[in-house]
Curated annotation (Swiss-Prot):
Additional facts recorded: During catalysis, the active site Cys acts as a nucleophile attacking the alpha-carbonyl group of tRNA-bound glutamate with the formation of a thioester intermediate between enzyme and glutamate, and the concomitant release of tRNA(Glu). The thioester intermediate is finally reduced by direct hydride transfer from NADPH, to form the product GSA.
Species of origin: Rhodopirellula baltica (strain DSM 10527 / NCIMB 13988 / SH1)
Binding site for substrate: T49, C50, N51, R52, S110, E115, A116, Q117, Q121
UniProt-annotated binding residues for NADP(+): G191, A192, G193, E194, M195, A196
Record's protein name: Glutamyl-tRNA reductase
Assembly behavior: Homodimer.
Gene assigned in the entry: hemA
Pathway this chain belongs to: Porphyrin-containing compound metabolism; protoporphyrin-IX biosynthesis; 5-aminolevulinate from L-glutamyl-tRNA(Glu): step 1/2
This enzyme's EC code(s): 1.2.1.70
Active site: C50
UniProt similarity note: Belongs to the glutamyl-tRNA reductase family.
Length: 426
């Protein structure tokens, strides 16, 4: 068996490199087609996300697929030079490739460790390969094991339950302390940059359905609002939006507060005493800190939220050794299972060969004795032959099983095939 991976990720390739090595849906389909033409009996799974591009190739023997074959495949399918692909894609083989896949699926190799999206992306990549008829017993086994490993890490550690980004902490931990649910609450988000986009994603996932994006550029506000099913307004209408808001969020890059304390106090007075949660995620701050003293107003600023992120990060780091131990156990288990499956046919053929020789020798012996032994004596002779055969076979078979359990049976496996003439099909 051979398993090889070539790939790059945010760890080792800048975004401009990853962009040139990423695959569109059509390019993925073309890659599977070309791979099938070149390697009819080999297997391939292709994982392409915004943070990583990885190809997992497998074959029944080391000669069936080389790492250079995968590099050539990527270069041809993406119309890139071979040197460019080779210089920016890391090669992993065997155990290293399996361990890497398990780390990826368990979200231990992600930009944000513990984020849940990557496991579904790994599953989708396998499903695409399966639909293209490019999977087989090796990729099936290793991706099944990766899925099992990821679920163990999720259930046996708390590494996935700690939010690390400011928007995720703000929406996932702070908002539930003030509102039982976001559905029906008027959410006014100021800004239309990356922080605003990430915050909107968490808001939508949290059930928010009454959103408004306010920005100096109405065009940018509208573009972001359209993506998330929100209203769009210019900064000219900010005061009116504040009066309506239940949740007010600041993510702009303005150098001064977008509304001063006295203006906010006047607007809050028009709200009829309704509770308002203000999340100031901006640097510099979008809101004067004194608005937190207003009646019914709960203000959380970037430093409050960053402190929670840092606490969560420390808690996640404490869980890392436990998660890594699970990865190591599953990698060991995968290779033990693989080796045991490989040794099973050899052990069976060895037993069959010994039983055949034993039966032939018993038949020859009883023929020479020419009926001079009774049934009881023949049974004793057969038992003696059985004991002799078992004692002779036990050491090599036990050694083979032990080596398989340790993942090192290849050398002994080949030696037994050669010594006992068991053939490659075993």
């Amino acid at each position: 068996m051979t398993l090889k991976m070539i790939g790059c990720s945010h760890h080792d390739a800048a975004v401009e490199i990853r962009e040139q090595l990423s695959f569109t849906e059509n390019e993925i389909n073309r890659t599977f087609e070309l791979f099938g033409q070149r390697f009819a009996d080999a297997e391939l799974v292709l994982l392409s996300t915004c943070n990583r591009v990885e190809l997992y190739g497998a074959g029944s023997n080391p000669a069936s697929l080389q790492s250079d074959d995968l590099i050539d495949l990527v270069a041809d399918c993406l119309n890139q030079s071979r040197d460019f692909v080779a210089n920016h894609m890391i090669i992993r083989e065997g155990r290293e490739a399996v361990e890497h896949l398990f780390l990826v699926a368990a979200s231990l190799d992600s930009m944000v460790v513990g984020e849940a999206q990557i496991l579904s992306q790994v599953k989708q990549s396998y499903d695409l390969a399966n639909d293209a008829d490019r999977t087989g017993p090796i990729t099936h086994g290793v991706f099944q094991a990766a899925n099992r490993t990821a679920k163990r890490v999720q259930t046996e550690t708390s590494i996935h339950r700690r939010r690390l980004s400011v928007p995720s902490v703000a929406i996932g931990e702070v908002v539930p302390e003030v509102f039982n649910r976001l559905q029906g609450k008027r959410v006014v988000l100021c800004g239309a940059g990356e922080m605003a986009e990430e915050t909107l994603r968490y808001l939508k996932n949290g059930g928010a359905n009454n959103l408004c994006v306010v920005n100096r550029s109405l065009d940018r506000a509208q573009k972001l609002a359209d993506e998330f099913g929100a209203d769009a307004e210019s900064m000219d209408s900010l005061h009116d939006q504040i009066v309506q808001a239940d949740l007010l969020i600041g993510t702009t890059s303005a150098e001064e507060p977008i509304v001063d304390a006295s203006t906010f106090a006047a607007l809050n007075a028009k709200r009829g005493g309704r509770i308002m949660l203000v999340l100031d995620l901006a640097v510099p701050r979008d809101f004067d800190p004194v608005i937190g003293d207003e009646p019914g107003v709960y203000l959380y600023q970037i430093d409050d939220l960053q402190a929670a992120c840092n606490r969560n990060r420390r808690e996640r780091e404490k869980q890392w050794p436990k998660a890594k131990k699970i990865i190591d156990e599953e990698v060991d288990g995968f290779f033990q299972s693989l080796q045991q499956r490989a040794t099973g046919p050899v052990i069976r053929r060895l037993r069959e060969r010994a039983d055949k020789v034993k039966a032939e020798e018993l038949q020859r012996l009883f023929g020479k004795l020419n009926g001079s032994t009774d049934t009881a004596m023949q049974k004793e002779i057969e038992k003696s032959f059985d004991r002799l055969t078992n004692k002779l076979l036990h050491p090599p078979m036990a050694s083979l099983r032990d080596d398989a359990a340790d993942g090192h049976s290849r050398g002994l496996l080949e030696a037994l095939r050669h010594l006992f003439n068991l053939g490659e099909d075993s």
